[in-house]
Amino acid sequence: IHRVLWLRTLEIAFFVTVFCFLMAYPIAHLLATLPMKYSNLLMICVLLPFWTSLLVRTASWMILLQQQGVVNDFFVGIGLVADDNRPEMMYNKTGSYVAMTQILLPFMVLPLYSVMKTISPSLMRAGKSLGGTPFVAFWKVYFPLTIPGIGAGCLLVFILAIGYYITPALVGGASGTLISNQIAFHMKSTLDWSFASAMGLMLLSGVLVIYWLYNKIVGIDNIKLG
C-alpha cells in the first residue's frame, strides 16, 4: 500500500508541475511583454493568492468543485455535461490536481517571468528577419533562453507538490492523498512516530535525489530565480 502511495505522490506532483508549466508560460510571457500598467495589474492577480490563507483557498475549491458547485453548474450551463450526470471532482485526484495547480501556479510564474524579462525583443525580430517563421523564431531563439526559468520553476513546484499536506487532505479524498498525509496519520492517529519519521526521511531523501539529478543533468548554477 505504501508503494502505491509513493507512486501516487510522484504522479500527482509530476502532473501538477506539468499543468503549472503549461499555464504559467503564457502568463509569464504576457507579464514580460505587456506595457507596464497592464503587466503590473496582471502581476497583482498572480500574487493575489499569497494574500489569502492557504486553508481559505483550499476551502474555496471545496465549494467550487462539489457536484452542485459553480464549476459543475458552468459545465451544465454550456451543455458540456447533463444535469443528472455531473462529474465528481471532489475527494479524488481531480480535486488535488485542480487545487494544487492553482495554489502552486505563482511559484512557476515568477521564475519564468524573471528570465523572460531579461530577453531582448530584438532577438525575436532578428530571428524573423533571418527568414524564420514566428513559431521557428520562438522555438529556436526565445524558448532556449527561458530554460533556466523553466528548470527553476519546475524544480520548485515539484518539490513543494511532493510534500504537500493540507490541500490533498481536504480535497483529495482516499485516491488523492499524498505521502505527507500518511505521515501525519501515523503521527496523530496511530502514534507510530518511528514509522512516520522513517517515511519523512524517505521523502527528504527523495527530494535530495531529485535535486542531485537536476544538478547533474541541467546544472544547479543555471537556475534563475530572479
Segments predicted by a language model, with ranges:
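Transmembrane alpha-helices and adjacent helix-loop boundaries
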Residues: 51-58
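Interhelical loop and adjacent transmembrane-helix boundary motif
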Residues: 169-216
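Transmembrane-helix boundary motif in ABC transporter permease subunits
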Residues: 15-47, 62-63, 117, 122-124, ...
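Transmembrane alpha-helices
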Residues: 102, 107-121, 128, 132-163
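Membrane-helix interface segments
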Residues: 34-42, 71, 122, 134, ...
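Membrane-interfacial helix termini and adjacent extracytoplasmic/periplasmic loops
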Residues: 58-101, 135, 171-175
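C-terminal transmembrane helix and the adjacent membrane-cytosol boundary/short C-terminal tail
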Residues: 113-124, 128, 197-226
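Periplasmic/extracellular loop-to-transmembrane helix junction in inner-membrane transport proteins
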Residues: 1-17, 34, 86, 189-190
